[in-house]
């Protein structure tokens, strides 16, 4: 092996990872990865705000989420990588793009982790036994447990995510069965008849007009966040070419049944005015039919969803930070890998930031905390847009005969990609129009963009030095945006 080849291998992003995720774990991550508090808890407030037509928003967003996943699937089968779309951004658009999207995605999960630890503590304190325990201690315990699971090995992460996803899926299936029985049998719920007549008696499909439906779109998009995790996880499976197409194609049924189906069923069983923000819509339904233990059971489910989200956040940021650290865009310690194949540096960095959030929560910052939650949506929009842009670049290069697309492809490309980018732009605009929190959230870009720019000038010498050592490669693959540098050996 030449000295140049040795240097390329030394900077390979996948070096040290263990292919430890089992097919059943990846399949369940694909099934339950996007089912979280955005559905179990957030759907209630959105129903109350937008009315029964909310299920259409979930459906439209679901179509674009599927297209984003198909774009990611094509990229993964082009080149499996645990660095996911950060690695692809480097390959197709260069080091600046990888730096920017890597830190934006890190921002997304760091903010989400702060919210998740606080949510876990809040859910635990709904049970009397935990009310005597300070909230920050509960949050710290939750973070310690999930952090430990992530640091041990990828198998432990996969097992925790497998069982968390299973609990969420079983809970939704139980609701779908019971709700369908009430709907099919025309049994009244809380004195109201069920079915389409319920909509006619309460203002129709759009009782609050179409504007609230647009406003809640950003929240629905956030509810779908983490679907891209299946692409990151595919980099740590032995046979991604067999597992990925099945996991991604099954998303159509998942979205139709679990998201669109659940929200439509909720709207057909009770008036939209019966739901309220802060209470799970599933608890509302089961309480109305006399099942008063529903609150405790659903609290277990939303607690599981928050634990799952925290678990996914630590896992994902560890891999993303490792990828950008290998290029010199992040602190060197975030590139460190344990003997068990865990990029612990990035995971620990996220945990430290989450600890800061736990302490901050003690001061009850009010709306500032909501802005933290919304800021994570900016990161996910940036990440999803990057996936689509990279797929469009791959499509263009394939047409030029420079690269070859895999057999598993983004349907209707490139037009589906252009339409998806337009959709993400509309989501950003609707977020900005959601006063005051959404407006302030988008306004934070005035701080974020200069901060990213300043950060780039701090690290660019190191990044370019690493790029020269890589010989213009991403691992063993040429970075088409950075032509190979001629070896001086």
Curated annotation (Swiss-Prot):
Spell out the Gene3D superfamilies in the cross-references.
Answer: Amino acid/polyamine transporter I (1.20.1740.10)
Q: Specify the protein's topology with respect to the membrane.
A: Multi-pass membrane protein
Q: Write out the transmembrane intervals.
A: 25-45, 49-69, 100-120, 137-157, 162-182, 210-230, 255-275, 289-309, 344-364, 369-389, 413-433, 439-459
The record's subcellular location field reads:
Cell membrane
Cellular component (GO) terms are: plasma membrane
Which domain of life does this protein belong to? Bacteria
Give GO terms for biological process.
Answer: amino acid transport; transmembrane transport
Which key words are in the record? Amino-acid transport, Cell membrane, Membrane, Transmembrane, Transmembrane helix, Transport
Please name the InterPro entries in this protein's record: AA-permease/SLC12A_dom, Amino_acid_permease_CS
Family per UniProt? Belongs to the amino acid-polyamine-organocation (APC) superfamily. Amino acid transporter (AAT) (TC 2.A.3.1) family.
| Protein name, UniProt field | L-asparagine permease 1
Q: Which organism is it from?
A: Mycobacterium bovis (strain ATCC BAA-935 / AF2122/97)
Q: What is the gene called?
A: ansP1
């Amino acid at each position: 092996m030449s000295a140049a080849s040795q240097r390329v291998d030394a900077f390979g992003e996948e070096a040290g990872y263990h292919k430890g995720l089992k097919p059943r774990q990846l399949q369940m991550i694909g099934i339950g990865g996007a089912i979280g508090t955005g559905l179990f808890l957030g759907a209630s407030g959105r129903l109350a705000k937008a009315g029964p037509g909310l299920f259409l928003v979930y459906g439209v967003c679901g179509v674009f989420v599927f297209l984003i996943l198909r774009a990611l699937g094509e990229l993964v089968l082009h080149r499996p990588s645990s660095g996911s779309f950060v690695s692809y951004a480097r390959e197709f658009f260069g080091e600046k793009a990888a730096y920017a999207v890597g830190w934006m995605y890190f921002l997304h999960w760091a903010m989400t982790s702060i919210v998740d630890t606080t949510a876990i503590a809040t859910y635990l304190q709904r049970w009397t036994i935990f009310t005597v325990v300070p909230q920050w201690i509960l949050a710290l315990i939750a973070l310690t447990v999930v952090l430990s699971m992530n640091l041990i090995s990828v198998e432990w992460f996969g097992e925790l995510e497998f069982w968390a996803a299973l609990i969420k899926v079983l809970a939704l299936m139980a609701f779908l069965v019971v709700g369908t029985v009430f709907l099919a049998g025309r049994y009244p719920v809380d004195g109201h008849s069920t079915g389409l007549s319920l909509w006619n008696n309460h203002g129709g499909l759009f009782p609050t007009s179409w504007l609230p439906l647009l406003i809640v779109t950003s929240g629905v998009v956030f509810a779908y966040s983490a679907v891209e995790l299946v692409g990151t996880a595919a980099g740590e499976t032995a046979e991604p070419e067999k597992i990925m197409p099945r996991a991604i194609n099954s998303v159509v049924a998942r979205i139709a049944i679990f998201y669109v189906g659940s929200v439509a069923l909720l709207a057909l069983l009770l008036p939209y005015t019966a739901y309220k923000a802060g209470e799970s819509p599933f608890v509302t339904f089961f309480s109305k039919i006399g099942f008063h233990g529903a609150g405790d059971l659903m609290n277990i489910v939303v607690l599981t969803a928050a634990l799952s989200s925290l678990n996914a956040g630590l896992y994902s940021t560890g891999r993303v930070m490792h990828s950008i650290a290998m290029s010199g865009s992040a602190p060197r310690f975030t590139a460190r890998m344990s003997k068990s194949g865990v990029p612990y540096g990035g995971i620990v960095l996220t945990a430290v930031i989450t600890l800061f959030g736990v302490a901050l929560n003690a001061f009850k910052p009010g709306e500032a905390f909501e802005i933290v939650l919304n800021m994570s949506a900016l990161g996910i929009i940036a990440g999803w847009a990057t996936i689509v842009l990279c797929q469009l670049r791959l499509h263009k290069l394939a047409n030029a005969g420079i690269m070859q697309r895999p057999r598993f492809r983004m349907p209707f490309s490139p037009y589906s990609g252009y339409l998806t980018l337009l959709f993400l732009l509309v989501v950003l605009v609707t977020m900005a129009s959601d006063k005051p929190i959404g407006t302030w959230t988008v306004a934070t870009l005035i701080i974020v963009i200069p901060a990213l720019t300043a950060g780039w000038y701090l690290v660019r010498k190191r990044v370019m030095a690493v790029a020269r050592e890589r010989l213009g490669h991403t691992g063993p693959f040429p970075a088409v945006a950075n032509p190979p540098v001629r070896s001086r050996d």
